[in-house]
Amino acid sequence: MRVLTPITGAILLAMACANAQAMSLTEAVQSAVDQHPEINASRNSRLSADEDVKFAKGGWYPRVDLVAGYGRQKSDNTNTRFTNPDGTSNHNKETLNYTQSDLRLRQMLFDGFNTSNEVSRTEAVVNSRAYYTQATAQSVALRAIEVYLDVLKRRELVTLATNNLQAHLRVNDQIGLRSERGVGSNADLDQSTARRALAENNLYTAEVDLADAEANFFSVIGRYPDELETPVTIKGEMPASLLDARQDMLEHNPYLKSAQADVNAAEQQYEVAKSPFYPRLDAVLATGANNNTAGQVGHDNNDWQAGVELSYNLFRGGSDKARLQSDAHKINQAMDIRNNALRTLNEDLALSWNAMTNARKQTPTAREYADTSTRVRAAYQDQFGLGQRTLLDLLDSENELYNANRRYTEVRYTEEFSMYRVLANMGELLNKQRISLPPEAIAQSEVKSEARLPDMR
């Protein structure tokens, strides 16, 4: 049995801690969804809409008002006037401190369907805000995936640039020694120095790009990237064709569902605008207690009332008709916004699908290019040992290998991110990544978009 030394144990413990602290792609996306301000703003918008529903439902409940008053009142009426014994009239006036109190209960019996339609409108707004919160979470998730993959890609490019520079430094040192001994030419030395400077510049550029990628990562995820796990490819989760992806987009994309809910809300607003054309009927129950009013000292007008009241507007200068027509135009506006959203999403889906297809076609050739360049470099090194290649030939092979590996790295990550873009446009990104949504992103009822492009009929 092998016994671990303290140093070996410490190294293994450090490696275990590093692996334990490595952030996965799902963890990064979940962190962004949980903390990003854009999603929190959408959540508060949904919570506000929930309160609007409660406000609208208040129209079904009775209204109770208490009115109380205190003041000084001067009266000149039949209560203060009297006839003198000689038959003459005495116009006496009384100034008294009075108190008034009234308690009134009013219950709506019929309001032209205003309350029920307003409740339906606010509930449609709740669905719109919920689906918009989903859409915002999906956009943030896609952005989180983009910055996550970008950091991984930039780190690989920094490694490639570092290896390329080290190779140039080794060859440059050898050419310098040959030049000092009079074996090599100054032209070879200058050319080697120029290529080494270019390799240094490539490394500086790669390091700056990595710093930018890490800054973007912090902005989206809310923390700096330390150890990141390389995610497993999602090729197996892609639809078979663009047509299948488009159909999934129509059924699942939350932006379309939010836009459709806005159309539903506009239609209910139109129904609300019809209520002024109906009479309103209320049940009224009231009681009052007054003191020192109308010139009478003491309690008077202590009465109660129970009945129904009907009010019906006959003319309002055409305002109600104008509002109805305005809300009709708002329905058309909401439908146009929904249809435009479909066109934009369909375009984004096609572009992401094309990018994925293009990168998928280029990946095998880019890999072949990188593998071939690796073999060429090895062959050049062997031939250099036999005197068949120069040091500049070795630099050529190093540059070719660097460009090939960089191209292969870029194509791989482009293909991977394009697949995530396709899932996002389909509305399946959060589900495929098993991301938990906040409760404010859950709609009260399912909404199916009625938007269609001409070629989808």
Residue spans of the language-model regions?
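Gram-negative bacterial Sec-dependent N-terminal signal peptides
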Residues: 1-21
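Bacterial Sec-pathway N-terminal export signals of envelope proteins
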Residues: 18-69, 75, 108-109, 185, ...
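Periplasmic alpha-helical coiled-coil/stalk elements that build and connect Gram-negative outer-membrane
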Residues: 23, 139-250, 352-355, 359, ...
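Small/polar (Gly/Ser/Thr/Ala-rich) solvent-exposed segments
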Residues: 40, 63-83, 90-95, 106-135, ...
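Membrane-embedded beta-strand positions in outer-membrane beta-barrel channels/transporters
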Residues: 102-104, 148, 307-309, 353
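Acidic, low-complexity, intrinsically disordered peripheral segments
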Residues: 407-457
